[in-house]
Amino acid sequence: MVKILVLALVFSLAHAQDFAELQGKWYTIVIAADNLEKIEEGGPLRFYFRHIDCYKNCSEMEITFYVITNNQCSKTTVIGYLKGNGTYQTQFEGNNIFQPLYITSDKIFFTNKNMDRAGQETNMIVVAGKGNALTPEENEILVQFAHEKKIPVENILNILATDTCPE
């Protein structure tokens, strides 16, 4: 099974530069972080994806999402700027360095490192999809990424059902 996961990762990374699959409507399925407080309900980094666009050969990635604060959905759009190492940088609740790691036609696994204004670092994994839950194979990939990022498995939250924000 590990060989399958490695092959899936290699395949997805080899095709990661074909960002056409990234564009369109997306929903946050799962979010995980080494700092659970940041992604719990009402947490500043618990975001619900809505749309991704790429510009300038995807050197700029625009992500539109909602954050729920005080039971109110707040729509936000950020633009990530591609860095030389394949990561993107943007500002939201501090500085964020993110990267799409695993891409299929209906799922995207992102890693994100957030450094908030107080200097606290939070390592995250965000899985966006077209509305379907993770398959058992995708869940194994998620758990593997969580181990690599030192994110406890119990900090993996399925949040698709808690998304009450507008389309």
From Swiss-Prot:
What UniProt keywords apply to this chain's record, in alphabetical order? Disulfide bond, Glycoprotein, Pyrrolidone carboxylic acid, Secreted, Signal
Highest rank taxon of the organism: Eukaryota
Give the UniProt tissue specificity note.
Expressed in the vagina, uterus, and Bartholin's glands of female hamsters. Secreted in vaginal discharge.
What terms describe the molecular function in GO for this protein? odorant binding; small molecule binding
Phosphoprotein as UniProt keyword: no
Question: According to its UniProt record, where is this protein mainly located?
Answer: secreted
Which sites carry carbohydrate? N57, N85
Which InterPro entries has this protein been placed in? Answer: Calycin, Lipocalin, Lipocalin_CS, Lipocln_cytosolic_FA-bd_dom, OBP-like
Q: Which GO terms describe its cellular component?
A: extracellular space
The record's SUPFAM superfamilies line, in alphabetical order, gives:
Lipocalins
Give the location in the cell. Answer: Secreted
Q: Which Gene3D superfamilies match?
A: 2.40.128.20
Cysteine pairs bridged by disulfides in the record = C54-C58, C73-C165
Signal peptide residue numbers: 1-16
Q: Which residues carry this modification: Pyrrolidone carboxylic acid?
A: Q17
State the family it belongs to: Belongs to the calycin superfamily. Lipocalin family.
Role this protein plays: Acts as an aphrodisiac pheromone, reliably eliciting copulatory behavior from male hamster.
What name does the UniProt record give this protein?
Aphrodisin
Question: Which species is the source of this protein?
Answer: Mesocricetus auratus
